[in-house]
């Protein structure tokens, strides 16, 4: 039976076998795919949910987020979200403040800006910096720091369901709003930049991303 299996494998071009597992599903930056060599991602709404395999791989990594928006008076809503009610993160404007909600498996660590988001054309941002086991989040309005929060832990695998721009698709990541909570202003562009880190941390994050993508197959 074993010999027959190998004969059939050769006949139907199954060989060579590849047992690399999650490595095959990890992020491989290149010029002809969704993951550029410079690790920069730009999104121009309106767009549908971005699959995990194509979205910015922020799980387990340090990253910068900048949203270029035009905000009418009193407009709220989600700018970027990834995950579900079980885990993930959401960046949104609520009650004139920029809010970052990090949903760590049902435990919400929230940062709010120390000053209101201005009306009209402006930028709002988030800097996420991981350490070995914890992380720090800094909120920015027009490039100026406006609040921060220490996270005692961070998730290496952020989401297996992808990301949403301008709304929160699926079950809400944050418990501070219901439904998709779409942003009522104009999102001109969202930029996410993956910050370089040591090879060990990068491999850990890449393997976690691979497991997330593999789980969706």
What are the functions of these language-model segments?
Residues 16-217:
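Extracellular glycan-associated modules
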Residues 6-10:
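Sec-exported extracytoplasmic/periplasmic mature domains
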């Amino acid at each position: 039976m074993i010999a027959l299996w190998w004969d059939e494998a050769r006949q139907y071009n199954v060989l060579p076998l590849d047992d690399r597992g999650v490595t095959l599903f990890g992020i491989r930056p290149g010029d002809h795919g969704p993951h550029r060599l410079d690790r920069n991602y730009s999104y121009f709404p309106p767009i549908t949910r971005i699959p995990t395999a194509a979205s910015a791989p922020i799980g387990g990594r340090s990253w910068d987020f900048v949203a270029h928006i035009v905000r009418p008076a009193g407009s709220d809503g989600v700018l970027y979200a990834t995950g579900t009610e079980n885990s993930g993160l959401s960046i949104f404007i609520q009650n004139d403040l920029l809010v970052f909600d990090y949903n760590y498996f049902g435990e919400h660590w929230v940062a709010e800006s120390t000053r209101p988001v201005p009306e009209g054309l402006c930028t709002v941002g988030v800097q996420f910096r991981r350490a070995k086991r914890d992380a720090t989040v800094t909120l920015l309005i027009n490039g100026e720091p406006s609040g921060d929060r220490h996270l005692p832990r961070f998730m290496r695998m952020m989401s297996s369901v992808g990301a949403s721009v301008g709304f929160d698709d699926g079950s809400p990541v944050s418990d501070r709003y219901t439904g998709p909570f779409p942003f009522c202003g104009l999102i001109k562009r969202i930029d996410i930049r993956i910050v370089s880190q040591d090879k060990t941390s990068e491999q850990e994050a890449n393997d976690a991303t691979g497991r997330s993508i593999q789980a969706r197959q």
